Amino acid sequence: MSGGGAPGPASSWVLTDLLAQTLKPEFTWRELRPGVDEHRLYGSNDGDGPTASILRYAPGANVPYHRHGGHEHVFVLAGSQRDERGTYRARTLVINPPGTRHDVVSDEGCTVLLIWERPVTFVDR
């Protein structure tokens, strides 16, 4: 696979220079929440089960406090994002275990590869 879009069933694909791929016009985005756009690589639209996406945060964008039902893998491709535990810059991999609770903010904007095993639940602090 060479652009945006998920592979068909039982197919393999390779995205070389993932950050550069996100700049191509055929790489489609949808608004996930204000200031955060998503390009879904695979997974269901209702977020049930494993899902992989590229998220693009505008400067100052955030995702409110939530709980992870499964592991979350975040690879920061460009920019930075932060949560209660620290600031994560480009080329940083963060793996959050099931049950992790946090909110995420990107002061400067960022692009991340995000893989969820299970959906997140928005919760009060």
PLM features: what roles do these ranges have?
Residues 58-61, 68-83, 90:
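Glycine- and acidic-residue-biased ligand/ion/polar-headgroup-sensing regions
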Residues 38-40, 52-54, 73, 93-95, ...:
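Conserved hydrophobic/aromatic beta-strand scaffold that supports enzyme active sites
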Residues 43, 53-55, 64-68, 85-86, ...:
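Short histidine-centered beta-strand/loop micro-motifs
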Residues 1-49, 125:
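A short, N-terminal "cap"/entry segment at the start of jelly-roll beta-barrel domains
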Residues 98-123:
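Ligand-binding loop in jelly-roll beta-barrel domains
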Residues 82-106:
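Short acidic-glycine-tyrosine-enriched beta hairpin
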Residues 50-52, 110-111:
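Structural motif
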